[in-house]
Amino acid sequence: PVPDSGRIAALEMARTLGVQYREGFVKNRYIGRTFIMPGQSVRKDSVRKKLNTIEGEFKNKNVLIVDDSIVRGNTSKRIVEMARSAGAKSVFFASCAPPVIHPNVYGIDMPAREEYIAHGRSVDQICEAIGADWMVYQRLDDLIAACTGDSTNAVTFDCSCFDGCLLYTSPSPRDSDSS
C-alpha cells in the first residue's frame, strides 16, 4: 500500500485475495499530504521525499499498489515510477475511492476540476497517465455498502467529490438578497 493512506484497504484486499500482505514503501512522517501542497514542483518533490522503496519487495515481482484516492495523479504516477525503478515487473494500481471529478465545497481546498486526473478521462487513459499496467477504482455503491455494512439505519454520506450531489446547499448571495 501507499503508507499510511492505503494500508487498511490493502490489508483487506490481501486477505480477500489470499495473498501475503507486504509493504514496499517506507514513509517519512514529517512530510504532509502532497495533493494539498501549493505548486506542482513542490508536490512532485515532496512525493520523492515522502516515500522510499524497499527494493526486495518489488524486484522481479508483479505488485498491486493501493492508495486511498487519486486526485491530480502526481503521487500515483511517482509511486508507479518508484516501483518500476525498484524492479517491479508489473505495477497494478487500486484506488479505494471512486474517481474524484468534483470539488469539495465543504472546506477541503481542492484544485480546479480541470486539474483532477479523472476529469474528462477514461480509466484506461488514467492508467496510461500514471504509468500503471492496470488499475481499478472503488465503485461508489460498493464504498457506501462497505461503510454501512448490514446497518438498517439510514445514513447519508457526502459523496459530492465523486457524484457532484451536494448534501447541503446554501443560497447564492443574490438568492439571499431580499431587497
Task: Explain the meaning of each model-derived region.
Residues 16-64, 74, 101-111:
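Short, glycine/charge-rich flexible loops or terminal/linker lids adjacent to PRPP-binding catalytic cores
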